[in-house]
Amino acid sequence: GKQYDLYAGALFHTEVEALEWQEAGSRWLIKTNRGDEFTAQYIGTGTGPLHVPKLPGIAGIEAFKGHSFHTSRWDYNYTGGDPKGAKMDGLANKRVGIIGTGATSVQCVPHLAKACKELYVFQRTPSSIDIRNNAPTDPEWFNEISTEGWQQRWLENFTANQTGDNTVEDLVMDGWTDLSRRVRSKIMSLPPEKMTPANMIAAFEESDFEKMEQIRARVNTIVEDNVTAEKLKAWYRQLCKRPCFHDDYLQAYNEPGTYLVDTDGQGVEKITEKGIVVAGKEYELDCIIYASGFEVGTEYKRRAGYDMVGRDGQKLSEYWADGMRTKHGVHV
């Protein structure tokens, strides 16, 4: 906030509770959970689709007597550390379980593995973990590419690579552009006379299989325990689940005291006062961390926190009762 001088025009840690159109004055009336009331001629609702935490529907979740929290509500008072990466010294003598192995967990596990006395990662389905190659930016390289308008050029190049444009250059060169270019290259290598829908699909599948075999083979080169390595291999096609890219996640399973608890696709059986049960075995824990993601597909007013009221008192939820519709729109 301070870096970009946002405090003069922003209300942080504030939730909008009501948004109502006022015919008199032709303005929107905005009410917040802090008691604010103000008006605006135009509004932009950048509430996003993924911000309401979702806890797993596991039997006994309320019975646990230890500490617990969702990853999006990280409790630094318990773990120690801070958002800048300070050591989480509050976990040095703790047995911690984390439920989930998706994109959030992949980011958390490497830090937890170094901080906890014991870390148990409860896995239903393994994520595909490709190389991220996250390294410090070379200043000389950046000076070469950061000429006026470079952000727009890179945005357009990324969009072109992701939307099927046969652009030769890949400025971004990350896992997402590689995925698109790899598939497109395989398809475009077909002779013109064999460019049929069936052959194009087969080429797509071949490209996907080759990449997933590469990702699975990488697990063996990193994870020292063979049983753990096999359980960490994504067995599905790359886009069946959100692809993940990380340089330290797989390595975390080589840390002493870090254990993968694979549930063989069944998920956690139940939660007790003392910990988590999988396949009849109870794992006693001091803390449970829920890396269980966010609500998807719930009605917009539940996730936004308000129901927009327009002309003649009509609520947006009523207007959208049969599906979303709008005359114009801007994607945020």
Segments predicted by a language model, with ranges:
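Aromatic pocket-lining residues of Rossmann-like dinucleotide-binding sites
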Residues: 108-112
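Hydrophobic/small residue at the entry helix of a nucleotide-binding pocket
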Residues: 104
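Surface-exposed intrinsically disordered loops and tails
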Residues: 83-84
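N-terminal FAD-binding dinucleotide-binding subdomain shared by FAD-dependent oxidases/monooxygenases
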Residues: 1-62, 66, 77, 88-93, ...
